[in-house]
């Protein structure tokens, strides 16, 4: 590994440093470091700051796109080589349109962002979070319950053919966990679980500072967890036992059973987490039945969290997703009460600091890592 490669790697990981600090960390002569930094500056990869006392990545050396593909929308973000977001856009999708049409829509959205780059700006990587397990290393969407027809879709390969840059694909909850670890409440936390509560439920797991995806990429797929052992052999279909209760869909369904909504909507037709908001609104208006519904569901969530704690013993549990914002105080209090009852030494429970931006933030970080790895290999 060349000294040029090592210096670039250290500048990338530190964000900003100084020549003397680089020399100390890498065990190199200061004169060697200074000469190599001048080479990296000439290549446009890094830049001196504060009168050459500091050095950091050149933000204009390249750009990345981070994408959050949800069950009802696609959110795009364009960031520079230092990870600063430059612009964002959001589009609605038709989930039933099928993979081919949605992939074309995503490609068009990426091209629209790339068209906004400076004249000599270069796209260097794209990362995308999807509502599905992803086959490790292959970037194959295994199955996406909220996107009909998305089974064994080779999304990574499709995007690589179109843009000729490195592509990273990951489950949406995992991507949110990456974002939270980069710039959220889990920053510098080695072992934590991010629980995403939206239309469905999922989790991203960090062990020893690294994302854990499991044998098939399905680690954290909480929707099939069962917390009612007498019903262990019932078939809950693609929804799964846990998700049929502990999710936006579950809250909406239970709300329609217990509250006089006068909406005429059937629970089976509900698709979005916003359909649970009428339960949260009823709670804010003092409806006791709404409180009963939510306490019952949050108690079930607490049992699930206690099981996670028993298996992983994490340092922190983070809650994110649209549903986590509906009644955060009641949710945290109920879950905490249940977990403390079951576990003698439970970890702290916190709400996501990034909320709706967690997945996009994780995608930007992942794309940056890809871009920087690609550049570093050229210097090895």
Predicted regions and their residues:
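ATP-binding/phosphotransfer module of carbohydrate and carboxylate kinases, centering on a glycine-rich
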Residues: 1-50, 56-122, 162-163, 229-233, ...
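Phosphate-binding/catalytic loop of phosphoryl-transfer enzymes
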Residues: 81, 122-241, 245-256, 362-380
């Amino acid at each position: 590994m060349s000294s040029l490669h090592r210096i670039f790697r250290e500048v990338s990981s530190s964000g900003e440093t100084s020549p003397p600090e680089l020399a100390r960390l890498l065990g190199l002569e200061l004169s060697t470091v200074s000469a190599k930094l001048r080479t990296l500056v000439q290549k446009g990869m890094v830049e001196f700051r504060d009168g050459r006392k500091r050095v950091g990545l050149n933000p204009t050396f390249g750009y990345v796109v981070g994408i959050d593909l949800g069950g009802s929308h696609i959110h795009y973000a364009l960031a520079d080589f230092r990870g600063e977001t430059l612009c964002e856009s959001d589009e609605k999708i038709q989930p039933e349109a099928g993979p081919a049409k949605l992939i074309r829509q995503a490609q068009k959205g990426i091209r629209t962002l790339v068209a906004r780059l400076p004249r000599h700006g270069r796209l260097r990587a794209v990362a995308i979070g999807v509502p599905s397990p992803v086959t490790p290393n292959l970037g194959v969407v295994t199955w996406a319950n909220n996107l009909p027809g998305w089974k064994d879709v080779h999304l990574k390969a499709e995007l690589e053919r179109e843009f000729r840059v490195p592509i990273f694909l990951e489950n949406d909850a995992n991507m949110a966990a990456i974002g939270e670890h980069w710039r959220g409440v889990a920053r510098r936390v080695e072992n934590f679980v991010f629980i995403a509560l939206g239309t469905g439920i999922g989790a991203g797991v960090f062990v020893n500072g690294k994302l854990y995806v499991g044998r098939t990429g399905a680690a954290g797929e909480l929707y099939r967890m069962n917390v009612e052992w007498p019903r262990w052999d019932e078939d809950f279909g693609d929804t799964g036992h846990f998700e049929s209760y502990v999710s936006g869909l579950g809250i909406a369904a239970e709300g329609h059973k217990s509250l006089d909504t006068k909406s005429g909507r059937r629970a089976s037709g509900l698709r979005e987490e916003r359909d649970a908001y009428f339960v949260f609104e009823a709670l804010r208006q003092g409806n006791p039945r709404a409180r009963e519904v939510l306490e019952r569901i949050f108690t079930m969530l607490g049992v699930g969290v206690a099981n996670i704690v028993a298996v992983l013993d994490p340092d922190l549990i983070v809650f994110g997703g649209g549903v986590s914002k509906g009644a955060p105080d009641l949710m945290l209090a109920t879950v905490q009460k249940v977990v403390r009852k079951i576990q003698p030494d439970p970890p702290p429970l916190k709400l996501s600091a990034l909320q709706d931006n967690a997945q996009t933030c994780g995608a930007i970080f992942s794309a940056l890592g890809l871009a920087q790895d690609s550049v570093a290999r050229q210097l090895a």
